[in-house]
Amino acid sequence: EIASCLVGSEMCIRDRSYCHAMGILITANHIEMVLVNLGDEIIKKDRIRLKFTAELSYCTEVAQKVKTFLEGELAKDTLLGIGVAIPGIIDQKERIVLKSHALGIENYSLRFLEQALEIPVYFENDANAAMLAEKKQKYPNAIYLSLNHTLGGAFCIDGKLFRGQNQKAGEFGHMILVPGGRKCYCGKSGCADAYCAASVLTQDNRQSLDAFMEKIESGDEKILQTWNEYLDHLAVLISNLRMAYDMDIILGGDVGGVLSDYMIPLGEKVMAYNGFEHDVSYLKNCSYTVSYTHLRAHETRGNLV
């Protein structure tokens, strides 16, 4: 298989549509999959409901979903590898998820999943994968805020992802934003995740983020109040991160993909907490809004080609 991949890599030099990479995002209740060629074109994408469990049967089921997803899409031996993104702290060398509150696992081996997929696999924390894809565009020094169902983060210094001493750098979602505040899924109270994750906007009515944003446009007063409170808390988090790191801040994830029309009111709120700067040009919209999982495939190309 490795030899076949090397042959494929030589073909990629001549034709970037020849070889492919796949990205998988694992969450508590779903897996998202995307297939791209080396020209960065999305060939196929899908989101499937699949509840995560720590049982070996889960790995087998993921492998079967991947096989079904890829059927009829590829010539033999043109898939260079798969990037798997996981909401948790990962020891890449040992192939272990050290801790994932979102999935409810600790010291979980990824080798069973790797064996089930039967192809080179690159594992990464979900926010780290997104940061790596963004910095390849134009942000060698930046923070990435992953505003998804849960809140994550990452940052690069001089083009290199900073992981920290214990692989925990960028866990902005579990910084205390409101002491004694709302209960976070991690067990603490007042975490930024409990105020700035996308789930804050969708949990009350079990609605989609798209439906929530449509209600903002229609002027729904209750929704507008929730949105303004959300932006207030996000502004505090942004201001704190700017003061601590003094670098660009990329707003990514599901909420980051819809914030472009609300950067002015968000910027005004941020400025109210920052007396050292006269603008918020350091706030950036994420480059990728079509498919969050696409970022994993994008990063996989760089690690396997």
What are these regions (language model features)?
Residues 1-8, 13, 294, 302-305:
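Single conserved hydrophobic/aromatic residue that forms the stacking wall/gate
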